[in-house]
Amino acid sequence: MAKSYTGRKRVRKSFGRIPTVAPMPNLIEVQKSSYDHFLQMDTAPEQRGNVGLQEVFKSVFPIKDFSERGTLEFVRYELEQPKYDVEECQQRGMTFAAPLKVTLRLVVWDIDEDTGSRSIRDIKEQDVYMGDMPLMTSNGTFVINGTERVIVSQMHRSPGVFFDHDKGKTHSSGKYLFAARVIPYRGSWLDFEFDAKDLVYVRIDRRRKLPVTTLLYALDGMNTAALRAQRAAEGRGLEQSEIKGMTSEEILSYFYGKVVYTRGPKGWKTPFDAERLKGVKLVSDLIDAKSGEKVADAGSKMTPRLGKKLREAGLTDIVVFPEDMIGQYVAEDIINEQTGEIFTEAGDELTANLVAELEKAGISELPVLAIDHINVGPYMRNTLAIDKNSSREEALIDIYRVMRPGEPPTLETAEALFTGLFFDSERYDLSAVGRVKMNSRLNTPEVADTVRVLRKEDILGVIKVLVELKDGKGEIDDIDHLGNRRVRSVGELMENQYRVGLLRMERAIRERMSSVDIDSVMPHDLINAKPAAAAVREFFGSSQLSQFMDQTNPLSEITHKRRLSALGPGGLTRERAGFEVRDVHPTHYGRICPIETPEGPNIGLINSLATYARVNQYGFIEAPYRKVFDGRVTSDVVYLSAMEEGRYTVAQANSILDADGRFTEDLVSCRRAGDFVMVPPNEINMIDVSPKQLVSVAAALIPFLENDDANRALMGSNMQRQAVPLIRAEAPLVGTGMEQAVARDSGAAITAKRTGVVDQVDATRVVIRATEETQASASGVDIYNLLKFQRSNQNTCITQRPLVKVGDLIQKGDIIADGPSTQLGELALGRNVLVAFMPWNGYNFEDSILISERIVRDDVFTSIHIEEFEVMARDTKLGQEEITRDIPNVGEEALKNLDEAGIVYIGAEVKPGDILVGKVTPKGESPMTPEEKLLRAIFGEKASDVRDTSLRLPPGVSGTIVEVRVFSRRGVEKDERALAIERAEIERLAKDRDDERHILERSFFARLKALIIGKKVVSGPKGIKAGTVLADANMDELHPSTWRNIAIDDDAVMADAEALKRAFDQQVDKLQERFENKVEKLQRGDELPPGVMKMVKVFVAVKRKLQPGDKMAGRHGNKGVISRIVPLEDMPYLEDGQQVDIVLNPLGVPSRMNVGQILETHLGWACAGLGQQIGGMLDKYKRNAATIIDLKSKLKDVYGDAIYEDEIAGLADNEITELAHNLTPGVPIATPVFDGARESDIVAMLTKAGRSSSGQVTLVDGRTGEPFDRKVTVGYIYMLKLHHLVDDKIHARSIGPYSLVTQQPLGGKAQFGGQRFGEMEVWALEAYGAAYTLQEMLTVKSDDVSGRTKVYEAIVRGDDTFEAGIPESFNVLVKELRSLGLNVELTQRNY
């Protein structure tokens, strides 16, 4: 197997037993595919699907004016090239966006006033600029105003229909009140609900409830529906008089079956239906109508068995006694045939009088509703009985009154309102998802997902399911099931936002079309694109889901992009979300990580996508499974949504299989419909793809996750995201095999776009000459510019280092440069350090961490943080501010780091208070004091009229200047520094251009030579005669640039040579054009905010060493704060003299139940031992005491035959030695989650490494030289330094700002605030009786304004007495009491 470039340099020994069947999808696929789907940039306008931006335009256009004389139609849209690339946008504070150009067509109609017929008069087409559309970078982020942002995907309730009950909470009796809710994607909500009297009501948009039959009356009757369909096919509508609503009879026949009572000579009888009588206790004897015999006694229960027996005995009709008929409900209107008089209406209850009257009238057939009050309840019939409306017209007007209370209803307006509510695609949209969900719930699969409004059948179907639930049939829905929650990703959120903007714009267009002369305008005169552009800007700038990217390290970036939030517009709020929504649900398996979620108020509302999960076209999360046939696992992988998965029996990935892929056990533990069951292999349909498919990326990076308590695993996965990139990254010895995928997909490490050979390498760029065949027009050179000391969003340092050497052959996809927190293409968030678990003088009490001085001395956990400071020179009323070195009242010492333009040099060491950029601001003429007047009179010179407003370094920051950027407004002359920066940038661009050109030339000349060598010359440059056959010698005499002029006698070859020349010239021209564009952008002035003439940004790199107060953590949730740095000689040491680096408290393990850290310690100890053995063998090899074969056999011994043959056997000798050198610190291993190293593996590794199998060693106390009483667990743990650094938190105030109202000092480091002396601290001083201390705390040190001044004056005089006055907060209290009408006055009393 061919290994990647970095894979040859370090091989991870994996303990995973389950082979990888399906590749893990790209980790930021969610973001990229969603936005691509929205923009459809790479699709030709004619071939774009009706989704995303295309659908938004299609749904809003065409726009007609009120008189319908003009129509504005949408033709197509196009995205042009962005003005600046990503890097320029970040530097200039711009948005990375492409101009959106929309082609619109204005059609003007002629309308004949007599006939009303329309004919086209004029068509005008035009491109209109509709603002800028932000583009996604290759890493799935957006650059908005120069900062990288991420749009978090939102989980929300899927559109469709949901059935639920109130869990018996509403009514005191505790009976369940069932309800159904139809939620559209856009439009009015429709709720159906039972009340305590078992009547069915409907609410529209949470308004007042109406009997559900009112809604049904308003729907089309059977005949009307058929007629409407027929007319629609003919292209006509219905007349008002032809529309009839549903009748009571239709409503009842839909919800209830019919039982016909027939009257014969012996009385009433009815067909025997065992199904209907199932479970009923017979009130009277059951008598066969044919024979008159009794077949069942009164009081007996009609069981299915008895029913079957009677049916087999030939029972067809049974006698109905008159008393049994009383209380039944009539199914149809019963009419006297002779007189036309209605005896009884559908739904009426039969009484003894009514039965007698019907018998008297000679009615022989009586249809009644099949309601038995056991299997079928009379809810709809009862609702019909209490409904005061009885016709379509009354129902429509009643609905109108509820929706528009206070407005006088007319039939037309009521009809228009009702149709607009649910049946008009402009106002109501179920969406494709909603339709699919509704079809599956109502079991109507024949309806296409393009039918996105409600149909009459849907409404009836929903009510029918609701009534059946009440009758005890079917199940209610679980709203936390992932089949009922879906994900809205970037594309969809953006689509909704853009639609809002376009609808705002539509109103304005309509008004404008009516107010202008439609014949003389062009489309762009009608369009004001501001609302659409503003909607986009608002969404990216201030939406709750558009977040400042967490860029602490590559993992935090990836996790942020894969986050799912239930909050945000149209979602839940923290306060209202209950426990059920936050809980882990069985359907989360393989879709949402059950571990990674924040601690605190957002727990469970913000989740992370599982590693293998993906989002399907409907927004449901899918998980992959392999199919199982007849107990044999196939390699066929399918993705299933939560709804589909419920139909299958799914085995775990770690089920034991034989070589043929069959299950070896008789009963296998499986999941089925949310439960765990044991089933035989032939019943299994699916099996998990991988054991790590159920956790998120961060959780999958924790080795031995299976041995950690879930709470600690949650902390571990959250804290990895806070790890600061260190100066020297080091990949973990004990990893999980996920490290490479994270480094690659996050974009931190640079991957090669094409196969090629490395041509040049330095710290800032890698130049690769492509060797794979490309189109003639494509360049044969790839230049990768590396980032150096760039500031991330969290002020950590982004810097990239090349891994390749000149001449290396690189395959496409190989990692060629490491980024922050990556080493050899693997994620490296922390360092491997030697840890001992033991107490040490109480310094590791309560999770404190004791570290050795070596860690600070060798910069093991040192990180670089980059702070950005900016200053603007504005144009003020009093004149322009100026950036200058000439600052009043400042000595030369303070200016030593500034150049002649007043800007600090790169490389200068600065400390708090140093000037970074000198700036002076004109100040107004202030009235002069007598002293100033005297000085002015004596010396006659005008005092300086500018004040110093220079940018100084704030307290707590000291470091080195790494970059300075100067931005000047267009038309403002650039200063010397700006010109110098510009020149350096142009030189860099020119070098890139020249290098690329040289490589292109070399490649072109090589191809040209290959074409013409060995051919006969017809004509050529000087020195070559016609008729010469070209050989290497002839060509080497000529300068390659003259080879172009050689003509040969083969026309076909000449044609190829000409094509080659043309392609080369085109590439060179393109190169030059690109260079000139960049230079032109550089030399052009910058777009600065209004009133700003010049802006300078200064970047300071701060080196942060580890110190007491910094927070550190392992990957298992074992966090702590550094308590003390101990001199090397005092640290406990091993018997070979090696000191341990960190001492942790053993008591941190048992109660926390994160045993994974102990297993990691043991395995890390074994890895280091094996590394030492390989290092020893390498030393022998270098001293020629061993051969390369010995080294290979050692590697084979360490890795085992399979890995050795697969990954190491094919390496060259120099690659073997490089690999061995990289393995000396320790052999890296992978222990994948839920499929990692067993205890036996760890023991075997320890034994192989020559360590004790207990993992414990004798430690010696560094202070006394005595060994400790018992052996101590020692090993290598991967520790992280977290972004909670004491330097960012420590803060002290001398004098500073005060709050305006209370006059108390402000709080917090950002405000340079004071320390709060709170209520409990006051109690402490009261308890000590420290009255004077307390008094000054509450007065002169806080908010006694006059007292503060007096203290200052006293200190200046050298006096140490002062008097406390009245605190300002007391005055505030007095004022508040006065505002309540209580006059409080202070009276002076002298005792």
From Swiss-Prot:
Keyword Nucleotidyltransferase (UniProt): yes
InterPro entries: DNA-dir_RNA_pol_bsu_ext_1_sf (IPR042107), DNA-dir_RNA_pol_bsu_external_1 (IPR019462), DNA-dir_RNA_pol_su2 (IPR015712), DNA-dir_RNAP_su2_dom (IPR007120), DNA-dir_RNAP_su2_hyb_sf (IPR037033), RNA_pol_bsu_bac (IPR010243), RNA_pol_bsu_CS (IPR007121), RNA_pol_bsu_protrusion (IPR007644)
Gene Ontology MF terms in the entry: DNA binding; DNA-directed RNA polymerase activity; ribonucleoside binding
The EC number(s) this enzyme carries: 2.7.7.6
GO cellular component, one term: DNA-directed RNA polymerase complex
One GO process term, biological-process aspect: DNA-templated transcription
Record keywords: DNA-directed RNA polymerase, Nucleotidyltransferase, Transcription, Transferase
One Pfam family recorded for the sequence: RNA_pol_Rpb2_45
Catalytic activity as recorded in UniProt: RNA(n) + a ribonucleoside 5'-triphosphate = RNA(n+1) + diphosphate
PROSITE patterns reported in the protein's UniProt record: RNA_POL_BETA
Function: DNA-dependent RNA polymerase catalyzes the transcription of DNA into RNA using the four ribonucleoside triphosphates as substrates.
Family: Belongs to the RNA polymerase beta chain family.
NCBIfam families: PRK00405.1, rpoB
Protein name per the record: DNA-directed RNA polymerase subunit beta
Record organism: Paramagnetospirillum magneticum (strain ATCC 700264 / AMB-1) (Magnetospirillum magneticum)
Gene (name only): rpoB
